[in-house]
């Protein structure tokens, strides 16, 4: 079979056997792509399972202790179930050590986890630092977003964003909550507070700078930290692709005054951030996206 050009995916399905139980036993089944393009990693010690902030989860324990030496023929193969996009959460800024089992164990604290996908690079087999978690109900989705957006794992604050990828909106932000002003893949000309405050608040777009040539690993927090050196950052966001969840390599920072904007352009244009020389300029209504 010809090799696929997309990244390898790791799916973890959880199917409750006894719905009436408060803590039902679960069966685990894996949906797998051809073995050449799939990286299944279930380690009880070398993954992010043990590095997540301390909590006890019978589910994650069962995942960790499931047979590591189990033959491929013994793994149940199932078709990927279809779930409403409203039940899916995007989880970004994951440490590379966090796998599907660790992610499922964490999100189980917010409700019943239906499916977990951690996205892996096909060529390197390394986690790309983001994934998706599907819950059973919208209430559980909202609870998970509120509980885990900004939750720290291995020193990294993960991003959790709920809901399907909506049509483009003028008032949106990648980190937005469920107050109606959010975008799954990141806002274009978003008017929301930094960190995705629920409901959003207006910011003055005239005091905004465009930041290009960003490293894929730079997130909202890193952007805010750098630009805070030049003034009061009202809003800072990296723009993400709605389909892949990957950074598009640029973002926007909004200051409280035009002087801070000018200072940021003068001081930070060409500065090295995470190995790349960033471009900083005054933001236009429709910024030219040069990469």
From Swiss-Prot:
UniProt GO molecular function: mRNA binding
Protein name, entry field: 29 kDa ribonucleoprotein B, chloroplastic
Described function: Could be involved in splicing and/or processing of chloroplast RNA's.
The entry's keywords: Chloroplast, mRNA processing, Plastid, Repeat, Ribonucleoprotein, RNA-binding, Transit peptide
Annotated spans, Disordered: 164-202
Tagged with keyword NADP: no
Annotated PANTHER family: OS02G0815200 PROTEIN, RRM DOMAIN-CONTAINING PROTEIN
Lineage: Eukaryota, Viridiplantae, Streptophyta, Embryophyta, Tracheophyta
Any single Gene Ontology cellular-component annotation: ribonucleoprotein complex
């Amino acid at each position: 079979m010809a090799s696929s050009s997309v990244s390898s995916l790791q799916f973890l399905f959880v199917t409750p056997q006894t719905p009436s139980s408060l803590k039902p036993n679960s069966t685990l089944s894996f949906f797998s792509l051809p073995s050449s393009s799939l990286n299944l990693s279930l380690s009880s010690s070398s993954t992010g399972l043990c590095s997540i902030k301390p909590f006890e989860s019978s589910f994650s324990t069962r995942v960790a202790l499931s047979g590591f030496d189990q033959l491929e023929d013994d793994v149940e193969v199932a078709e990927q179930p279809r779930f409403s996009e409203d039940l899916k959460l995007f989880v970004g800024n994951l440490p590379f050590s966090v796998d599907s089992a660790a992610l499922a164990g964490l999100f189980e604290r917010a409700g019943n986890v239906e499916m977990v996908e951690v996205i892996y690079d096909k060529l390197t087999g390394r986690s790309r630092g983001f994934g998706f978690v599907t819950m059973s109900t919208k209430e559980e989705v909202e609870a998970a977003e509120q509980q885990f957006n900004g939750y720290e794992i291995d020193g990294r604050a993960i991003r959790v964003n709920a809901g399907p990828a909506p049509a483009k909106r003028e008032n949106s932000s990648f980190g937005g909550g469920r107050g109606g002003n959010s975008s799954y893949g990141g806002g274009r000309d978003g008017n929301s507070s930094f960190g995705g405050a629920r409901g959003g608040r207006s910011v003055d777009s005239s005091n905004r700078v465009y930041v290009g040539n960003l490293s894929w690993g730079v997130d909202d927090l890193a952007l805010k930290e750098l630009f805070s050196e030049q003034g009061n950052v009202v809003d800072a966001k990296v723009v993400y692709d709605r389909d892949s969840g990957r950074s598009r390599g640029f973002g926007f920072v909004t200051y409280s005054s035009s002087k801070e904007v000018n200072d940021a352009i003068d001081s930070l244009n060409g500065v090295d951030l995470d190995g790349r020389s960033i471009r900083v300029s005054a933001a236009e209504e429709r910024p030219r996206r040069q990469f």
